[in-house]
């Protein structure tokens, strides 16, 4: 049964909230929270973050004239309540589904999403851009950026704040302090904000205010409580933010609608310099299972609303992430120089398991990929064996450091690139599409693409053994294929692939976990009387040139298959073949890559089918290369 939401049913846009009383806003927040819980229970997605900002979301849309006033959410995974209030409630149960709403803010989706997001710490920079454009054109609309305490561990947030005072006189930054990003926030800024909230001045003021107000007649007690809320900023300070040129207001209770509305109304009037409003919230607020286990309810699959039990299917094989963590532990037990680095994603990268075994050799640097990479470079320069486990999409944030601090110096940093390829429901912002290209372009870099769990174990062993240059290995989200993993895998011979199946007419050269689909394609071609060789490249750099030349020499057509963008493995293969004159005799070649678009969210298998990277797509490419009618093969390449 859907929740009963009589007040929310009357709200079709934020304008409908602006005539509501504080009591009605509280009721609306309760109904938005119930609607969010019910919707996410059916779709899965990010739950805890959105529940923590329900009151803040309602208050912001009540006080500010969105979409005229610009409201930018950092990261965006907390924006489900925002979507419910901004005309998308009728589609909220399509979140993260094919053809449905994005799980993040998205410009193409609504005028209420002026700036898309999914990566951390972009909001203040984007907001400053809106401020500068507004100021130049003489408009008077307001600009607000909402950023979490976890994102405040990213340097980009401070780059923007450092630039704010000299850029504009009107910007409101809402610091949503829930003391919980995905993992607990780390570093000096997290400790600083904790001191603000727990400081003696703040606590003394609260206690004094409560004691004094109790002596007042009842009608004055509420007024005294409001005065106490407004005065907090004057007592607690917020010196760091003030030194950056901001007014500092807070900390205030992010679930107190009355306080939120009044503070935001005052903040909206400030137009002589930027203001930071420090709001303290609880992740998962209002849903007991999420309050008790915020880390377990950051991102969820479908779940039972009553019990909170998530409908997780029994895995047929361990995830690639878990295999990585287990294998790294094995090597760390044998080599005390092995250390691990994560950028605020210990559970997502599996390094929570490594950290349980080797806490003193595990470094969580916060949402700071640039720092993570150069920190790893420093470790490597002094003889350690660092493994930087970073999602492919987030490694993009530290690419200059990969080039300048690691590759140019030939430092043996090992990059464990998780979430390679398509990631399904998280869509284009989280797809691992580009790492093969941008890593493979670097002189001296070793780039591996394991085909299964056992090959991943061998790639890790290879990275441990490489001590004179950087290396990287990529692996996807989700379960492996169920192959047996050796007790301790042997390293691979660098730059050597393998023949998995011998054939004659066409060669299929796979890089990464499309090997299974390549073998299926070979079976389908065999059913049509076409013999296919299937090879596993193992390395995108250095390429196995001997294998390439053999495949080119012995087959009429060559098909390369990869889970990456144009300009990656297939491009490297073409370059190598051209350099060796292997294209001169008329070899028919097709390079199968992800399409040259940003694919919207869907089930991964549907996305790979759209890309032509499933068995049927590989068969179509092979038949086309050979000039054979493929009308009997279902589907088409997108």
UniProtKB/Swiss-Prot annotation:
It catalyses: D-glyceraldehyde 3-phosphate + pyruvate + H(+) = 1-deoxy-D-xylulose 5-phosphate + CO2. Binds 1 Mg(2+) ion per subunit. Binds 1 thiamine pyrophosphate per subunit. Thiamine diphosphate binds at residues 77, 118-120, 150-151, 178, 287, 369. One of its GO terms (biological process) is thiamine biosynthetic process. Coiled coil: none annotated. Its cofactor is Mg(2+); thiamine diphosphate. Its EC number is 2.2.1.7. GO terms for molecular function: 1-deoxy-D-xylulose-5-phosphate synthase activity; magnesium ion binding; thiamine pyrophosphate binding. It is an enzyme of class 2 (transferase). Pathway: Metabolic intermediate biosynthesis; 1-deoxy-D-xylulose 5-phosphate biosynthesis; 1-deoxy-D-xylulose 5-phosphate from D-glyceraldehyde 3-phosphate and pyruvate: step 1/1. Mg(2+) binds at residues 149, 178. SMART domains: Transket_pyr. Keywords: Isoprene biosynthesis, Magnesium, Metal-binding, Thiamine biosynthesis, Thiamine pyrophosphate, Transferase. Belongs to the transketolase family. DXPS subfamily. Homodimer. Catalyzes the acyloin condensation reaction between C atoms 2 and 3 of pyruvate and glyceraldehyde 3-phosphate to yield 1-deoxy-D-xylulose-5-phosphate (DXP). This is 1-deoxy-D-xylulose-5-phosphate synthase. It comes from Phenylobacterium zucineum (strain HLK1).
């Amino acid at each position: 049964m859907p929740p009963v939401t009589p007040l929310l049913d009357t709200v079709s846009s934020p304008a409908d909230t602006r005539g509501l009383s504080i009591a009605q806003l509280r009721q609306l927040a309760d109904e938005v929270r119930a609607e969010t819980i019910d919707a996410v229970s059916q779709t899965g997605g990010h739950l805890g973050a959105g529940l923590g900002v329900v009151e803040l979301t309602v208050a912001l849309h009540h006080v500010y004239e969105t979409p005229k006033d610009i409201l930018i959410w950092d990261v965006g995974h907390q924006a489900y309540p925002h979507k419910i209030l901004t005309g998308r409630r009728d589609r909220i149960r399509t979140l993260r589904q094919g053809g449905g709403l994005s799980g993040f803010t998205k410009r193409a989706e609504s005028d209420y999403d002026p700036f898309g997001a999914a990566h951390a710490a972009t909001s203040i920079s984007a907001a400053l851009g809106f401020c500068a454009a507004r100021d130049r054109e003489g408009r008077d609309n307001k600009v607000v950026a909402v950023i979490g305490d976890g994102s405040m561990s990213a340097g980009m947030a401070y780059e923007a704040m450092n630039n704010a005072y000299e850029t504009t006189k009107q910007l409101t930054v809402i610091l949503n302090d829930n003391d919980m990003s995905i993992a607990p926030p780390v570093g000096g800024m997290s400790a600083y904000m904790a001191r603000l909230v727990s400081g003696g001045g703040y606590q003394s003021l609260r206690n004094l205010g409560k004691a004094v107000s109790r002596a007042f007649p009842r009608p004055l007690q509420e007024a005294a409580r409001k005065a106490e809320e407004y005065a907090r900023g004057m007592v607690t300070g917020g010196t760091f933010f003030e030194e950056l040129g901001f007014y500092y207001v807070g900390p205030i209770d992010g679930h107190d609608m009355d306080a939120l509305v009044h503070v935001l109304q005052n903040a909206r009037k400030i137009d002589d310099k930027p203001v930071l409003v420090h709001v303290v919230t609880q992740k998962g607020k209002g849903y007991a299972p999420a309050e008790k286990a915020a880390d377990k309810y950051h991102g969820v699959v479908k779940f039972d609303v009553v019990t909170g039990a998530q409908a997780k299917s029994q895995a047929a094989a361990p995830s690639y992430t878990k295999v990585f963590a287990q294998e790294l532990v094995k090597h760390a037990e044998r080599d005390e120089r092995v250390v691990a680095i994560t950028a605020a994603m210990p559970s997502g990268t599996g390094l929570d398991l490594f950290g349980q075994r080797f806490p003193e050799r595990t470094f969580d640097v916060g949402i700071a990929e640039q720092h993570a990479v150069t920190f790893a470079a420093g470790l490597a320069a002094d003889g350690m064996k660092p493994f930087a486990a970073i999602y492919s999409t987030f490694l993009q944030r530290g690419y200059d450091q990969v080039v300048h601090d690691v590759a140019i110096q030939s430092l043996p940093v090992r990059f464990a690139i998780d979430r390679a390829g398509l990631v399904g429901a998280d869509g284009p912002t989280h797809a691992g599409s580009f790492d093969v290209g941008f890593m493979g372009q670097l002189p001296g870099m070793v780039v591996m693409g394991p085909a299964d769990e056992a090959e991943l174990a061998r790639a890790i062993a290879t990275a441990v053994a490489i001590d004179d240059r950087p290396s990287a290995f990529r692996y996807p989200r989700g379960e492996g294929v169920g192959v047996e993993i050796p007790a301790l895998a042997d390293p691979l011979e660098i730059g050597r692939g393998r023949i998995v199946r011998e054939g004659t007419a066409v060669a299929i050269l796979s890089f990464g976990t499309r090997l299974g689909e390549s073998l299926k394609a070979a079976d389908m071609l065999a059913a049509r009387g076409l013999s296919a060789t299937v090879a596993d490249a193992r390395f995108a750099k250095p390429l196995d040139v001997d294998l390439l030349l053999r495949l080119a020499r012995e087959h009429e057509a060559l098909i390369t298959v990869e889970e990456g963008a144009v300009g990656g493995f297939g491009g490297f293969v073409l370059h190598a073949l051209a350099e060796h004159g292997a294209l001169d005799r008329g070899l028919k070649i097709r390079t199968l890559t992800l399409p040259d678009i940003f694919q919207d969210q869907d089930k991964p298998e549907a996305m790979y089918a759209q890309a032509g990277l499933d068995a049927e797509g590989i068969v179509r490419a092979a038949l086309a290369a050979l000039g054979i009618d493929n009308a009997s093969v279902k589907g088409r390449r997108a």
